[in-house]
Amino acid sequence: KTLLRWITSGANFGDPNSAKVAKVEVLPAQRMMGAHGQQQLSVIAHFTDGTIEDVTTTAVYEANVPEMASVTKHGLVKTMNEPGDVGVMIRYQSQVAVFRATIPLGAPVDHLPPQRNLVDAFVFKKLKLLGLPPSEVCDDSTFVRRVTIDLASRLPTATEAETFLADTNPNKRDQWIDQLLASNDYADTFASKWSALLRNKRDDEQMELSRPGTYAFHGWIRQAIQENRPYDEFVTGILTASGEASENPATLWYRSVKEINSQVEDVAQLFLGQRIQCAKCHHHPFEKWSTADYVQFTAFFSQLGRKKGEQISEERIFHRSGLATAAHPKSAEKLLPSGLGGLQLSIQPDQDPRQFLAEWMTARDNPFFARALVNRYWKHFFGRGLVDPEDDMRETNPPTNPELLSALTEHFVQSGYDMKNLVRTICESTTYQLSAKPNQYNMDDRQNYSRYYPRRMMAESLCDSIDVLTGSVTRFQGMPVNTRAVQLPDSSFQSYFLTVFGRPKGESACDCERGSDSNLAQGLHLINSDELRNKIAAGDGRAVQLANDKDRAMTAKIRELYLTAFSRPPTEQEEAFVVEYIDLKSKANPAAAQQALEDILWSLLNTKEFLFNH
């Protein structure tokens, strides 16, 4: 109808000097609502000439969690029965606003677990507001396995698990976290994560020629993680990298991300949590970024130069002298560099604009930089960000716990962008150490962290964990024997297992490349693949070694298997069942003990308790 009225009135494009919409206001902006409640929103547009207009019936609405609330085209919000926060995005012309509804459960929260740090302070505050009692703290077996997988991408050894369980030191959990943070496994784990996000990958058409640079960049990333290089320095080293890979491996990022638009979009998404791809052509529909913002950000990379390096496969990255500008695609106006939401900068022709970009990004008052990293790391440990997706931190996609995100961001900045300190703070919290077992109230909770959310091990961790349990070794072409999957420099190594379990391809700055869902191909591979059968029956594997060990009791061998797989000893029922099964197999044929142990290994690695971090 609006379009028809415009056409019948002469399709006038209007006066370019007329008042524009300066902001949109939604009333109410926030409300505590019960399950199956309703709230009619009112939307007011404020114009640059000071006038206002009710635009409730012409604004556009969208709920960010449709499972929690719906909204009609005229702004009537209807909540479901899932507790938590839901945002409704409102857009009118180029402006946006957000209505937030909090849906409490209303159960009594009388007894909270011990509060250990700022994470717990804000999580428990939210749980009290919602009336959502948390689960109990997990036991030692669950904790040592959980945190070792998250920090080291591996299972604790049977000896490590048994030692940890026997330790009576009340600070043993914190000490184990520190031990993992100091390990090579921690550096391997997060180097693998960052290498994929930075798109460090060999060129498919020049696999061998591009190998040295790819390996060098992975090594540079790993060293930064191992040394705990401050995050602001880590990012600055990548953005301002100049020279050749042989002298400065960080320049390889510019080989992987060649196009200027890709550089702009990757930096915004990866380091600032802002998806500005839409703004390249038009105003982002649910964000404030315009095409001008996109172009001004592009200008930071406008003077990036490339020339042939000394090595055949290498380029030399350098700053081309000249005024940094970028042309608006519609007006052709030359725009100066500007950070998102910042002022345009006049940079001298002999100055590298990338340095100014890095300084703007890493400034302590930057509203995006530290916040994006905190949210990304929160997702690593909890399976979802405080803002989800973790790299879509627009105003219209609000965090589920704004106070926690702000406090943790401030803590990270005050620590000097210390990534290990951030990881330690998260892992030492009671919130991280809650049990995955739901109580009668929090089964449906998916966003408030009233319990730990189980998730399948990532592909590399699962591959390495199966090797540990079976005592086998996965061989990767061109790599030393005993190289773990998580230590691979890039995703170019052929492995059906890693592919089917969701290893990222390294073709995007989005962690969404990593597959975490279960599927039929995974199940069939675990149950009946030659690869798994060969690992279980490996000539120097665990089943053979245990079968040939005549000095240990069968109960001790079973204990080793359970400690390795689950970081806990078997229950009496489990032990009795396994002993009986092996005895039955061995009575018919004494040599069948090995086959029986192989059967037990197969059954253990196909359990959810093994496949999931919980």
Question: Which role fits each region the language model picked out?
Answer:
Residues K1-F124, L129:
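Extracytoplasmic soluble-region selector
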Residues T2-F13, A521-N528, L532, I536-A537:
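Catalytic cores of secreted or luminal carbohydrate-active enzymes
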Residues P113-D185, A196-Q477, C512-E513, R533-L597, ...:
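Primarily short, surface-exposed interaction patches in extracytoplasmic proteins
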Residues D188:
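Metal- or metallocofactor-binding catalytic centers and their adjacent structured scaffolds
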Residues A191-S192:
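Amphipathic alpha-helical scaffolding segments comprising HEAT/armadillo-like alpha-solenoid repeats
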Residues T470-M479, V486-Q487, F497-R503, S508-I527:
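Long, His/Glu/Asp-enriched segments that create or flank divalent metal/ion-associated functional microenvironments
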Residues I600:
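Globin-like tetrapyrrole-binding proteins
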